[in-house]
Amino acid sequence: IAMPYLFDNVVLAPCHNDFIFYDLLRYIGEVFDLHDEFFTQEFQIKLININLAAPFFIHISTAFWMSVVTAAPYVFFEIWRFVSPALYPNERKGVRKALGLGTVMFFVGVLLGYFMVYPLTLRFLSTYQLSATIENQISLNSYIDNFMMLVLCMGLAFELPLVTWLLSLLGLVHKTFLRKYRRHAVVIIVIVAAVITPTGDPFTLTVVAVPLYLLYEMSILMIKDKKADETEEIIETGER
């Protein structure tokens, strides 16, 4: 009973002209008197199914991935329960904060992917034509595959600060390294953003690139300096 409702109002919502982000773009166009097609375009697509068993398997796979997303907080909680007994009190505090932040950041990434990145990508790719004689017909499989990939990739991309912090604990990444190669990181971030959103317009590129860059800066802030780590180790050794 729930899946048809979720498909119509959540998964397939970006197909419809009244999707919240499309309404927002048109509102911005009206307020600032912008006549560019990017802000005024009316958008509506109808998906087709060309595989007999596709609806059944897509039903199962979509339910699975939605379960993965909604179960993320519980997964992080179980990870915390597993590692916490082996940690010192000050380490537990840091890991607890990191896992809490990781959960929040994952959902922020998923929401950004769902409400902004995927709708913009869908609108561009579904209306892009090699020739006027070629009619675009979007299959259900193609839609779902791209939907899941982009939304989940954005969620995972927002885990960058947590991953970087964990790598720093293992001694594989240092704050000085990230600062030194910041310019290189900016170039890589722009390239990744361009791949994720092949729309070609600067607005969409900025929407993706800016959060990714902020995540990079957050990663730097989360890593402690070597001197601070050494001081804490000396204090902990004295307390023991």
PLM feature segments, named:
Residues I1-R240:
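Membrane topogenic/interface segments and analogous intrinsically disordered interaction regions
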